[in-house]
Amino acid sequence: MKQILTTARRRTVLLAVLVLVAVLVLGGRLAQMQVLQHDRYASASQTTNTREIVHPATRGRILAADGTPFVRNIAHSTVTIDPQVMREQDDDGRSIVDAVAREVGADPETLWGRTRTCGSKDAPRPPRCNSGGAYQPITLAEEVDPAELLPLLERPEDYPGVSVDATAERGWPKPNDALASQTLGYLTRVSAQDMEGRDDLQPTGMIGRDGLEAFYDKELRGTTGVTKVAVSPAGKFLEEIEHTDAVAGLDIKTHLNPAVQKVAEDALAQVSQIAATNNEATDPEDKGRAKTGAALVMDVETGALVAAASLPGYNPEIWSGGVNSEQLETLVDEDEGVPLTNKLISSVYPPASTFKAISLPVAFSQGLDPDEEYSCPARVKVGDRYFRNFESKAHGDLTLQEIMEVSCDTAFYRWSFRTWRALGGINAKDVTDPYVELAKGFGLGSRTGVDLPHESAGRIPDREWKLAYWESLKEGYCERAETGYTEEEEPDAQRRAELEEGAQEFCLRGYQYRGGDAVNFSIGQGDVSTTPLQMAVVYAAIANGGNVIEPRVANEALDVSGEVQKKFSTTVRQRVGFDEESLRILREGLEGVVTRGTASWAFEDWDHERYPLAGKTGTAEVAGDQSTSWFVSYDAGKDSKYVTLVVLGDSGTGSEYAAPVARSLWNTMESEGLLEPKAADEPLSSQDAAADLKAAAERAEKAGAETVTVEDVTEESLVGPVDTEFQQADEPSDDPSDPSASDEARDPSGDASASGD
């Protein structure tokens, strides 16, 4: 018995020792955690048990030049529910959601779907599911009728976790009924791709997709507010730890004048309908044309865009609440003219005779005599192809100014061909083409830098471009040259033979920069393409003395109190080094276009003494289509202020369709007080060329802008009788009665004729 007690006592002592050791170990570990590693575990505890609730900032407005809003925020009521309260309910909050649905007249399943986390098993597809955080209030219903909200407000105890908040969505007041839809842009929901690398975006937020909404998204969106809360391990709210208020976005004040913008939109739409009607009357099969175009007004010194219209336009209210698939299809439908595309900056057209304002200074640098007259025959011959004047008209002997007034094509063919020949013709290598260089000097072939997204660079087709173009297509054309075309592909035997011959020619010699390329280039045809805004910048440079400016829609950014926080000033990108006499002659020619030349009928009752104008028409002809009409103009007083541009695709001549739209713009600008009347003793801009060149040079030097000039490479006189033939023996033959002037080695499927008014 004594032995048994001794054994039991030993076991008790051993157990006590083990317990003591365990207590000491646990106590030591606890001390380590509480004292030695206190900061580490306190931080871990805080991180694990805190949550952030994001408060969206009010988005800034987009304002007209006078401060009236083009885009504003419209407050409306939104019903939200706290996800934490839902989790505390036995049915996960389903009964609360159903009760809210009954009160606001909504489908319970739709509202319940909005509470389900996107990607979970029972969640509908985005955006009908919840993409917010676990503690972010969930939006159940938006734009609710105030009468339906009364039960929620009067008996909040019946709807635990439910709140009625005032939120904002975009509204478009349309000042003066102006839309400016493509310029303003639109918003859509933030996508997962948008979130990559961005900590300023929220999955439930909106982001600018186009126009000013996209370009100035950072300024407009503001800074979100954040409330940091402590929660228990079970997720229950404990207390608010920290709160940061949201900071409203900045308002973007533009240079847009609503009255001028409205006229630009309406006049474009009206002349588009007239052109379509006239074309259909001429050809009953010609339907659905003249649907695209653009019109603008820009300050020639600052690049400020006073009006920026794109045809066809659309009502921006289509974005309210999001577009459906049918609406989106209409916005991108080519048969409807792709309303979503901003034709001002994203669409390109052959500039046609408006390009002669670049080619004349080039030809002048190659030896033109300002005191001579130059013949303007109906046609000239390059290789075995005739290149004709617009409507095959002959105008006799003309001064350089008169050549611009009547828009003589054949004079430019002659000048550009001689320069091409002086450079080595088709055998030229590593040459500097003055026509190409000055076009690039005016900014063509590069984006203007305007504060709008999705801008096209256009195309200046030099020798390098043609080689690259040929290399990209030669395999297909060489294969066609070998296999030919089947009767099923082209039933007409003559057309089939033409296609096969064209494929053979392109396969073997499509890389050559030929005389046809050169003469097409000189009048803005062939493969030359520009955006409307690019050509406006060209004419602004002519009006201001040579400075190529960067256009701007936005003027400044304002905070909620109206204080200026940012100024969006423009810059001189580069300078065209005009010869004084060259600029004078060019300006005189452009002034004559409006008073005596191709655009004179549209301005026959205009007060030229008080408000002198200068401009150039253009008619770009593309095989198989109606012509694209152009008119670019500027006020031609001592200090030119504005340039206007109008282009209408697939319509007719520039004098018939584009010039009348410009006339409407100038009428409105005069009535709005934007034009300064010329004093009787003040010179025209052509007579003030020297002063403008000096002022432009000083500004360009201050901006550090490069000056672009061209050298005389022709080394032969451009004076004298017109050559009866510009014969190039190794160029292929073609039908001499063919009025087109496209390059004979171009892609046969995209032929363009060289003709302009």
Language model region names:
Residues M1-A214, K218, T224-D245, I274-A294, ...:
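Membrane-proximal periplasmic segments of bacterial cell-envelope enzymes
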Residues R94-R102, E142, L150, E154, ...:
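Solvent-exposed, polar/charged alpha-helical surfaces in well-ordered, non-transmembrane soluble domains
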Residues L152, A248, I252-A269, R699-D734, ...:
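N-terminal leader/targeting segments and the immediately adjacent pre-domain N-terminus
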Residues V564-T571, A659-D734, D738:
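Short, gly/Ser/Thr-rich active-site loops of penicillin-recognizing serine hydrolases
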Residues T110-P124, E169, E280-T302, P377, ...:
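Acidic/histidine-enriched alpha-helical segments
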Residues H55-P56, R72, Q89-G93, G133, ...:
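Solvent-exposed, acidic/flexible segments
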Residues P233-E239, H243, G293, E301-S353, ...:
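Beta-lactam-recognizing serine transpeptidase/beta-lactamase-like catalytic domain environment
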Residues V260, D266-G313, S320-G321:
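Phosphate-binding glycine-rich loops and their immediate beta-loop-alpha structural context
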